Amino acid sequence: MPKSLTHNGVLFPQSFESKGFNKIDNIEISLLAEEMLWKYSPYMFNRFKNDEVFIKNVWTDLKPQLPKELQNKEFPKDFTKLFVAMQVASENLKLQKSEYNKSHKKEIEKEKNERKEKYGFCYKNGKKTEVGNFVTEGSRWFISRGDLRGRWVSSVNAEDVEINSSEKVPCTQEGHNWKKVELRDTDYIATYKINIGFGTAYVDKFVWLSANSEDKQKDNEHKYEKARKLLLKIDEIEKTVLKDVQSKNKLKRENALITYVVLTYGIRIGNDLGEDNFRDKNVRGASTLCVENMKLENNNKIHLEFIGKDSVPYNETMEIEPIVYEQFSKQLSGKKSSDKIYDLATSSTVNAYLKSIYDGEITVKLFRTAKASGLLAKEIQKREWKNLTDKEFKNNLMKCCLQTSLLLNHHKTVTEEQKEKATKSAENKIESAKNALKRTEESAEKKLAKLKKAKKDFKDCLEGKLLEEKLNEIKIKEKELKDKISKAEKKYEDTLKEVEFKQSALDINLGTALNAYSQPKLPISLCKYADKDPSLIYSKAQLKKFEWANKVSKDFWRKYPNV
């Protein structure tokens, strides 16, 4: 518990102002209905335009806000003209903002910096510490891959916000009061719930200390160091788990079975929060699987098929130890397809079990971090890293990260439209590289032909030292031109490899594993070894977040334990 925590509270987004679309077919609509329609209009033209669940949910929440005369319309078809007009108006507003004069832009920037200084920092035990996003979330359509996608998220008021502070904090919303102000032993300065679908669901939100804050930096470093130490004991832990799979104690046996699956294949424990901190009852993980999610196959193989966190499907066949296969066979016996595989074990009992077999702080998430970091180290240690171009270096490292992301099942939804766009972009890139190579080859071949003729002419009319000098000059130019062709060919080959990799990883979220599960000292030490700038791999925000990793030696990646 901090002795003191002081700050100026959180801010609220500006309320929606009418954009002039307050009538439909000469029928007046409410400001809320206009806001809902305005904020839906972009979705008419992106990946949600054909999402039936999203559209159905939007209409569920929008319809009651419209006058009765408009409730019989077909949504979204009968609103198409309105949405097009709204998008045109939206683009015009963006254009107006881009045309602000310098003094106006400076004034906006000044106000932004003043807000940041006043609300973007807190004082924890007297020490100034940066806060993350100090503005509460605004009203919007709920974007996720779960069944609630397309429901309306209502705006937040001060009465919804609990403030974590050791002193009174004046309310920043005029005419309102905070729900509660008290000092808590947490890393957030405020918490509130967002209301989805007019009371259908509520989701907790937090205003955390910034990832760049000293406390967060220390926590991050500590997490990855714990994961490294855990890797050193992983073989010993796996032996214990295999022994406990045969335990006469049913709870211990179930805990060990779940741990085995998590340890071996990096599957999430289950019962965790998805996008927007929402727990979807249809989402499965290692501890929440039903009989229908697991199929026993021949040769000690099981097939797992379920919907995981963030509605990402998991569909894999895996080979397991014979004793584990035998226990799963017993576990499934006599159960209906809708029954849970485990009768006693939960995510909480698994974490308690892990603490009982390992002397140190441990959770399933830490196991996933350890496995991800160990696999990244293994992939990195397989390769040569000297004398690579920046593009080669980045592509090779991303290929290593791909294996980590596959282990963690970090997939993302890719629509047919996005696939087509990516394919077209790939084709254009290859065509452009092919044309560039062709131009280089044709230009160089013409020059080489001229040099060949010049060489013959010199031999016919010159001799001695002068001839030798001229032939040497031609030899140098020929080498330069051949090198130019070789470089162009290499560039073309690199483009083909890059495009092939991007296409293969189209539905993989490479960033999550790199940013949240993989020891950042590995890429940073590798960059030092290969004399590359870490900004090739990490964004500015990530580099700031991982500032603590900068002191790493250039050989750290060589010595890191792998899996």
Task: Pin down the residues of each PLM region.
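Extended accessory and catalytic-adjacent subdomains in large enzymes
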Residues: N177-W178, K193, A201-A449, D494-A541, ...
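Acidic, low-complexity interaction regions
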Residues: M1-E174, K179-R184, A190, S356, ...
